[in-house]
């Protein structure tokens, strides 16, 4: 697999119907504007939308991790960073030059990226792009295995292949051309990937149970009580696929966490006090074992609240239903 070269220096500004796109230098010319999305992607009146992703990891918790190398654009998969709504960073993932899904970040991340700084949103997009590139080159990959499902832990809609979560649908994972409901976003994202990665037939409609899923689990979660917050860290590479303390396989991109005392299965809303971003995680491991830290998040959860790049962050913790 080739690495993904995310173009860095700002080369110019172009306009689109819905946003102004900042184009980073040394990009292939085909990346200079968002392609029109054909109506063939939508088998019904439903549209497509956004993302966040999940593989497997495990038991011993760590206080830091080595980030994966930056993804380099391939002939099939590419990433286009640009200015999104409200001057936020947006990173659009393309397959065969067709925009599939956009990852939304913050205005601070947009400024950081123009200064060559690594951002959580870019890392999240690179993780998805890297895995799609791997799947597309696998000998026995079948694009018809790409479907929409429901994460049993977070109750969020996901796009998956077989039992592997490729990305999670949330408020910061949207369709490039417009923002739709979570079910519509999930359906169109899955159908675009099915078609562009191998010409599989579209999914006509989602089961009724998936059509009412919420975009943000924590919005619907009722707080039972606030517990002691403090410094959160994260762990991932090196533990992926290993057994957690409760016996399951650790998935670094799933929304899970390690806590010293909370019962396994407890759902905890973790809020980054610096930026207000929240995520609901499920406790499936023990830790952290470094003094002064109260919770150890999976890599996916750390990205969701913006502490992946910094390694640690000050958080509030609430037990939720």
Curated annotation (Swiss-Prot):
<dbReference type="InterPro" id="IPR012997">
    <property type="entry name" value="RplA"/>
</dbReference>
<dbReference type="InterPro" id="IPR036908">
    <property type="entry name" value="RlpA-like_sf"/>
</dbReference>
<dbReference type="Pfam" id="PF03330">
    <property type="entry name" value="DPBB_1"/>
</dbReference>
<comment type="similarity">
    <text>Belongs to the RlpA family.</text>
</comment>
<dbReference type="GO" id="GO:0008932">
    <property type="term" value="F:lytic endotransglycosylase activity"/>
</dbReference>
<comment type="function">
    <text>Lytic transglycosylase with a strong preference for naked glycan strands that lack stem peptides.</text>
</comment>
<dbReference type="GO" id="GO:0071555">
    <property type="term" value="P:cell wall organization"/>
</dbReference>
<keyword id="KW-0456">Lyase</keyword>
<dbReference type="InterPro" id="IPR034718">
    <property type="entry name" value="RlpA"/>
</dbReference>
<protein>
    <recommendedName>
        <fullName>Probable endolytic peptidoglycan transglycosylase RlpA</fullName>
        <ecNumber>4.2.2.-</ecNumber>
    </recommendedName>
</protein>
<dbReference type="GO" id="GO:0000270">
    <property type="term" value="P:peptidoglycan metabolic process"/>
</dbReference>
<dbReference type="InterPro" id="IPR009009">
    <property type="entry name" value="RlpA-like_DPBB"/>
</dbReference>
<keyword id="KW-0961">Cell wall biogenesis/degradation</keyword>
